[in-house]
C-alpha cells in the first residue's frame, strides 16, 4: 500500500498556510528593500498568493504549494519575480535565497517540537495494515528528512517499510517514482494500491500500472476535485481489510 503524505495521512494545511504566508512576507520585504512601490508590492502579493494557491479560507488542495515539490514551487516563484520585471538569473537567485531563509525559520520552529498532526484514523489504519502483514510505504514530494521527521514524530517507523521523496529521482508525479519505490519494496506495481489526495498522484499511479487507485478527500478545508480514482474515500474508517486476503 503506497501512501501520499500531505493531505492524505498528514493534516498539512495549517503548516502550508504558514509556509505560504512566510514566503510571501519574505518576498515583500526583499522587494521593498529593493525600492518597490506600494502598488508593486500589492501586485507581488496577489501574484504569489495565486501561485501558491493561498486563499482566504486556507490553501487550495490542487495548488502549487499543496501538490508540487519545493523545486517546482521555487521555479514558480522565480517566474512571478520575472513578471515583476526581474531577469531570470536574478529572479532564480532571489527565489532560492528567499526559500532558504524561510526554510531556516521553519526548521528552527520544528526543532522546538512542533509537528504536523495525523488525520483522524490514519494511525489506526496503518497499524491495522501492519498487523495484517501488508507492506506500507510513503511516496511524497516532501524531502527525505521531512518524511522521516513525520514518521518519527508519530512513531510510525514500525508501520512504514520505505519511502520515496523529492530527493529521489525521478520524483512525483513521474510514474518512474512508483516504479522506483516498488523496486525498493521488491513488489510489482500491479500488486499495490496507492492512495492520494491529488489527481497527479492518481494519474501517476495509473500510468505506472498500480492495481488500485484510491482518492482521499478529507485532508483539506476544501475537498479536492478528483477524477482519476477507482474509489473515493472520505474518512479512514471506510477502509477495512477483508479476511486474510488483505484486499480492500
Predicted regions and their residues:
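Short, flexible loop segments at the rims of nucleotide/cofactor-binding pockets, characterized by
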Residues: 112-117, 141, 169-170
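N-terminal helical cap/lid subdomain that shapes the substrate entry/recognition surface
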Residues: 1-120
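Asp-based, Mg2+/Mn2+-dependent phosphohydrolase catalytic module
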Residues: 1, 29, 123-131, 144-248
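Conserved G/P- and acidic residue-centered "switch" motifs that form tight phosphate/ATP-binding loops
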Residues: 8, 140, 197
